[in-house]
């Protein structure tokens, strides 16, 4: 008797689990994932170059404006995509809001590093890139967690 009841119970539990995903998390968006990945890769490369001493001189800033702009553009698209995701219930909206907040936090850190680079250059091994890397890592993980 318990064997015959077990299958429907497992099926019901599976359906409820899948249905709860729509309640607690927004649907996966491949464009959002692609944009945050592009931005994160740009941030990681920029941080690695800075930590290797390539940007000690503020005169190197004009040569990296395009890199900063590309990262910021990818983050802007990611933030818009994240903010406009459809959702089924309030918990999913909270997840979306957190995702957008993390993306905007990453963008603010990139902007801060760009300003530092422009004003005085980036000295390696001073932690100048750490906040940006941590913030952008959190944003990327939040987006990829929706897969």
Task: Describe every region a protein language model picked out.
Residues 72-126:
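Long, amphipathic, charge-rich alpha-helical segments that form helical bundles/coiled-coils
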Residues 17-20:
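C-terminal motif of bacterial Sec signal peptides marking the signal peptidase cleavage site
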Residues 116-147:
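A charged, solvent-exposed segment within the mature domains of Sec-exported extracytoplasmic proteins
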Residues 48-90:
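Alpha-helical segments in soluble extracytoplasmic regions
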């Amino acid at each position: 008797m318990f064997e015959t009841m077990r299958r429907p119970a497992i099926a019901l539990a599976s359906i409820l689990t899948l249905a709860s995903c729509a309640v607690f998390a927004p649907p996966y968006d491949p464009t959002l994932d692609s944009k945050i990945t592009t931005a994160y890769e740009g941030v990681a490369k920029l941080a690695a170059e800075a930590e290797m001493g390539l940007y000690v001189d503020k005169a190197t800033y004009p040569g990296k404006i395009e890199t900063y702009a590309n990262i910021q553009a990818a983050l802007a698209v990611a933030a818009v995509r994240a903010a406009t995701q459809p959702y089924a219930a309030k918990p999913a909206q909270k997840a979306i809001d957190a995702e957008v907040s993390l993306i905007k936090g990453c963008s603010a850190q990139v902007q801060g590093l760009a300003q530092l680079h422009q004003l005085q250059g980036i000295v390696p091994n001073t932690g100048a890139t750490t906040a940006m890397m941590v913030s952008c890592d959190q944003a990327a993980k939040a987006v990829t967690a929706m897969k």
